[in-house]
């Protein structure tokens, strides 16, 4: 599929430049980088747990849309040329028995010490933000140069084998008159989380204070704006915590891998 997608050479260059910048030490959230190019989340689990996770993702496609799977010992993805998933995310989280024990900017040594890890690359809602902006909908965390707010919700994912957990959601404040357009745009892109899972009432998701996200930064919500929530690719990290997987590596929330695939490739 991917080799047949026509990409503007300038966009390809921007994506490669972003990956090289990250590889050289860039350490900030990636929303808005290489605009128009798909970004992905990541989770690496031991081979013994890989089938359970693949089934978990299959049963929960809105929060865990798998775009690529890398077998143990493979670190380059077909989603991008000259790629290395051990260096091309700005920041990684290291997990042991469901607890985060470290955060690093280069994961090569850790992958080398755990050669049995299978890696899942998962669609990211950053990939529909250019389309929102082109429709005149402000993406607040890009405008304010902050990280997107993310929350552990009370929505239970469908379990698979030994893996279970709740959905993580991301939030974007949208003016009330633009919500229908935001829904239409994002619904066309199910491979990067698709339409919102909830609009308007954080408490219905178990969120007691929208200004205190579990991951990322709080967003300004102006008069006339409504909080809109989408499924989020940090959901696998919630599953790692809940299921106490013995070892895992993930991206840090908001710190993504930038691919060579344009966002429009996922539009239905």
UniProtKB/Swiss-Prot annotation:
GO terms for molecular function: lyase activity. This is Putative hydro-lyase ACICU_01268. Belongs to the D-glutamate cyclase family. Its EC number is 4.2.1.-. The keyword Lipid biosynthesis does not apply. The lineage of its organism: Bacteria, Pseudomonadati, Pseudomonadota, Gammaproteobacteria, Moraxellales. Keywords: Lyase. InterPro entries: D-Glu_cyclase (IPR009906), Putative_hydro-lyase (IPR038021), UPF0317 (IPR016938).
């Amino acid at each position: 599929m991917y080799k047949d997608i026509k990409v503007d050479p300038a966009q390809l260059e921007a994506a490669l430049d972003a990956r090289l910048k990250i590889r050289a030490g860039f350490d900030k959230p990636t929303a808005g980088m290489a605009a128009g190019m798909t970004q992905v989340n990541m989770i690496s689990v031991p081979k013994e747990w890989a089938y359970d996770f693949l089934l978990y993702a299959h049963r929960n496609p809105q929060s865990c849309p798998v775009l690529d799977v890398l077998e143990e010992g493979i670190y380059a993805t077909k989603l991008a040329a000259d790629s290395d998933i051990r260096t091309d995310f700005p920041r990684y989280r290291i997990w042991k028995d469901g607890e985060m024990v470290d955060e690093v900017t280069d994961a090569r040594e850790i992958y080398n010490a755990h050669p049995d890890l299978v890696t899942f690359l998962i669609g990211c809602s950053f990939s529909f933000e250019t389309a929102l902006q082109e429709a005149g909908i402000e993406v607040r965390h890009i405008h304010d140069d902050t990280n997107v707010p993310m929350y552990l919700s009370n929505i239970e994912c469908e379990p698979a084998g030994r893996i279970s957990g709740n959905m993580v959601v991301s939030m974007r404040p949208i003016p009330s008159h633009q919500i229908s357009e935001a829904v239409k745009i994002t619904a066309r892109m199910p491979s990067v989380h698709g339409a919102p899972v909830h609009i308007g009432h954080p408490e219905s998701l178990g969120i007691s204070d929208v200004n205190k996200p579990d991951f990322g930064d709080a967003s300004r919500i102006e008069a006339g704006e409504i909080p809109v929530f989408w499924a989020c690719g940090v959901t696998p990290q919630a599953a790692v915590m809940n299921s106490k997987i013995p070892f895992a590596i993930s991206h840090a929330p908001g710190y993504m891998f930038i691919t060579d695939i344009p966002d429009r490739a996922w539009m239905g």
